[in-house]
Amino acid sequence: MVGKARSSNFTLSEKLDLLNLVKPYVKILEEHTNKNSVIVEKNRCWDVIAVNYNAIGVDRPPRTAQGLRSLYKRLKEYAKQELLQQKEAQSEFKSSVSEPTKQVMEMIPQIASFGLIRDRSHIQSANLDETAQAGTSSLQVMVDHHPVAITVEVKQEEDIKPSPPLVSNPQLSDTLEQREEHELMHVVEGSESPSLSSVDMRMTSSPSSVPRRDEIFHQESGEHFRSLLRCDPQVLQMLKEEHQIILENQKNFGLYVQEKRDGLRRRQRLEEELLRAKIEVEKLKATRLRRDLPEYSSL
């Protein structure tokens, strides 16, 4: 693994200690924005994490905040790769993944949805292949029962393997079958000549009269898949949490600006009071000086 090779200079206990130290600040560190206040807050968090990490054990080499940040990114990337491999192997990933990956999944639940979305795309493509094969067989049966003797040859690509039995979309399949039936009836009605050779010649010379099923599927399956992603409860929950974090950050930034303004006002008042006090002191000094002079003392 690329992530494992890069972080080989860190032991397993060091990785787990880093994840335990990052856990209280994960909400701030996982906020992806370019706001200056958020960037400053992230840097402050990493400085605190580096100080706490170096204070754990004296036998470990000291680590900088930038080095710990790079290790944290590599651990997240390694967790994604490991989950994807476990998904492809169809094994119980919760019992076979490494301990750092388990902690990353507990801290960032969105990591687990990375493999789910990937699997959903594979299942959707398999559904489309199965529906295409079912539509091809229905087209051949419909031509066999037609009274006009028309030979239609449908060639499938040799490198396509039959997909496993999955749940197909019946509404999409019915719509496509109706379209093909309409196109086929249009071709048959347009050829009323008794000569069968002319019909065969028209069918063989213009293969584009009946649209390819894969082109129709590419057009309609994209919209269907995007609508599935938009309605995914995990994606909606992630968007909701992100929106709440943005609102909370805006609220905190507003409080910070208000406190800064109040502090500037208090500082200005204190400076004015100090200036007035200095003026009073100077007046008292001048009065005392006049009293000490001989010409004023005689008066």
Curated annotation (Swiss-Prot):
InterPro entries per the UniProt record, alphabetical: FSBP, Myb_DNA-bind_5
Indicate where this protein is primarily found.
Answer: nucleus
- What keywords are annotated for this sequence in UniProt? Isopeptide bond, Nucleus, Repressor, Transcription, Transcription regulation, Ubl conjugation
Where does the protein end up?
Answer: Nucleus
Question: Which Pfam families does UniProt cross-reference here?
Answer: Myb_DNA-bind_5 (PF13873)
GO CC list: nucleoplasm
Return one GO MF term: identical protein binding
**Cross-link Glycyl lysine isopeptide (Lys-Gly) (interchain with G-Cter in SUMO2), where in sequence:** 94
Annotated stretches, region: Disordered: 189-211
User: Composition bias, kind Polar residues: at what positions?
Assistant: 192-209
Subunit comment: Interacts with APBA1 (via PDZ 1 and 2 domains).
The record describes the protein's role as: Transcriptional repressor that down-regulates the expression of the fibrinogen gamma chain. Represses transcription of GSK3B gene promoter via its interaction with APBA1.
What this protein is called in its record is Fibrinogen silencer-binding protein
What organism does the UniProt record list as the source?
A: Mus musculus (Mouse)
